[in-house]
């Protein structure tokens, strides 16, 4: 528009009731991004602060005592004023790109089993946490795929689960599948590393941006209790 972006504080308020079907699950609010500095208040109590506007962050409702059926008031303070303590670190009028303000990406309510894959950012492990996929010995003939999956047990009792990882092509055809068991004490989290070899891989390039899918499942017996898909 040719105008300067709005700079300064902004407030958001949301009333909600935690759905009854989340009973026995761990519930978090996942913010994809909000620009600048954010302070979160739950039912009038300051809960946490987050700096920076490009990475997601979460608010753990369960850890803050919210249970299924509870009525909640969430207040979010955001401020995209110039601040050297987080990127971009310079005055906005010197930037050659639009600098957002407020909550500019989606916010999700996520309910998980007490035994589940961790959040990659909340885990605070470099090169780990959540589902971390990396590669080695890549050529047109073969590629080694390594999948690290971190699982946490928030239950009050020890649990034994199976981590099942399936690699598929873009059409959903199964290429490789690997599974392994984890035993977790209450409050414990562990990682499992699984290796798969892909023959004649379709390599990504700007001209052929082909992506495979890594499907992760946490199983208790024959029942899937958590999971997700990572595009690689």
Where are these regions (language model features)?
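Accessory beta-strand-rich segments of carbohydrate-active enzymes
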Residues: 2, 6-127, 154, 170, ...
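N-terminal carbohydrate-binding accessory modules
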Residues: 153, 215-232
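Beta-strand-rich binding/interaction modules
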Residues: 40-42, 140-183, 190-194
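Short, hydrophobic beta-strand segments
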Residues: 61-63, 193-204
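Hydrophobic/tyrosine-rich beta-strand signature of extracellular beta-sandwich/beta-rich modules
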Residues: 76, 165, 214-216
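Short acidic/polar inter-strand loop motif in beta-rich domains
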Residues: 78-86, 201-203, 219-227
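Extracellular Ig-like/FN3 beta-sandwich strand-entry sites
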Residues: 24, 69-71, 142, 158-160, ...
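Short strand-edge motifs at loop-to-beta-strand transitions and within beta-strands
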Residues: 12-14, 55-59, 180, 188-196
